[in-house]
Amino acid sequence: MRKPFSSVPQQRGFTLIELLVVLAIIALMLTLAAPRYLRSLDKAQETVLAENLRQMREIIDQFHRDTGQYPDSLEELVARQYLRALPVDPVTESDRTWVLVAPGAGFRGKIYSLRSGAEGVAPSGRRYADL
């Protein structure tokens, strides 16, 4: 004859307190890691922006060497196949926010250089417009 409830197997698992401790540890780790992750994203945006500006300035210079004048618009660089498409400013997330710098007197064309139209300061401490 069996005794009721005497042979109930011991249940195995985690207690509520153990689960809460683990969740607290995970939350603590996230609060330490999240700011570093966000800073690294900002640094990456600055790096991509600086590289986009460097490449665009080189392309404008190449256009000037080839044609003897500076381009009248960024779209002209695409139309003449110096660019496949206008690059996106990673800070403003738009290809329409570039600030165009005109050449000095005596030069033909309208774009000597360009800057970012993004406001604010990059993680390096420089203004985005000064990159």
Where are the regions a protein language model picked out?
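Low-complexity, acidic interaction segments enriched in glycine
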Residues: 51-131
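Amphipathic alpha-helical protein-protein interaction surfaces
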Residues: 25, 45, 79-82
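Aliphatic-rich helix starts adjacent to a transmembrane/signal segment
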Residues: 36-53
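N-terminal single-pass transmembrane signal-anchor helix
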Residues: 10-34
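N-terminal leader/signal peptides at the extreme start of proteins
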Residues: 1-12
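Hydrophobic alpha-helical segments typical of transmembrane helices
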Residues: 33-36, 73
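Regular, well-ordered alpha-helical segments
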Residues: 31, 39, 46, 58, ...
